[in-house]
Every structure is written in C-alpha cells, then in structure tokens.
Regions:
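Short, mixed-charge low-complexity intrinsically disordered segments
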Residues: 37-88
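Generic N-terminal leader/processing signal
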Residues: 1-3, 22, 59, 73
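Short intrinsically disordered terminal tails
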Residues: 1-5, 85-88
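Short aromatic-glycine-(Arg/Gly/Cys) micro-motifs in beta-strand/loop hairpins
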Residues: 2-14
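Short, surface-exposed linear segments at secondary-structure transitions and domain or protein termini
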Residues: 25-35
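Compositionally biased regions
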Residues: 8, 19-20, 24, 69, ...
Length: 88
C-alpha cells in the first residue's frame, strides 16, 4: 500500500464573519458535515483539484471521520494535512 499526502483548503463558517478560534471538537464537528462546495482546493505532490471528484471527497470524509488529519486556521480558512493509504 502507498501513502499519499493531501493538502486541503476549505472555508470554515460564514465567509463574511470568519473565525479563527474554534476548539478541536468544533473543528471536527464542522469537518464531519463538510460539503464539497466548502473545499476550495485539494493538492498532492503531483495533482491539484478545485472541482473535487466524488470518490476523492468520500475518501477525504472517511479520513476526517477517523480524525486522521492535522489542521491550521486563519481568517476563516482551514488548511488540512492528511495522509491516506491507497490500495494498489
């Protein structure tokens, strides 16, 4: 199996009333309910998506539900880093 590192940028909360102060649980609860339109882009070492394929979105959601990610926040933007095991 191969691990692939994903970087995800999303808008969290209201675009006009952005927040930078959410607890880990608040961030996780928001991520569990994330919609495709909340994600601005997804990057790997070799690929880039602004319009995320449904299969990739489901893979990201599974990783989020498993709490397999690190994140940073600033001005209503959330940056996720996650590694996903890919089957050959």
């Amino acid at each position: 199996m191969k691990k692939l590192k994903f970087n995800v940028e999303a808008i969290i909360g209201d675009r006009y009333e952005s927040t930078d102060l959410l607890s880990k649980n608040e961030v996780h609860n928001w991520l569990v309910n994330i919609q495709k339109q909340d994600i601005l882009k997804v990057e790997t070492e070799n690929d880039y998506w602004e319009d995320i394929p449904q299969d990739l979105f489901e893979l990201l959601k599974t990783n989020i539900e498993d709490k397999n990610y690190n994140y940073t926040m600033a001005k209503g933007h959330l940056w996720l880093e996650m590694e996903i095991l890919l089957e050959p």
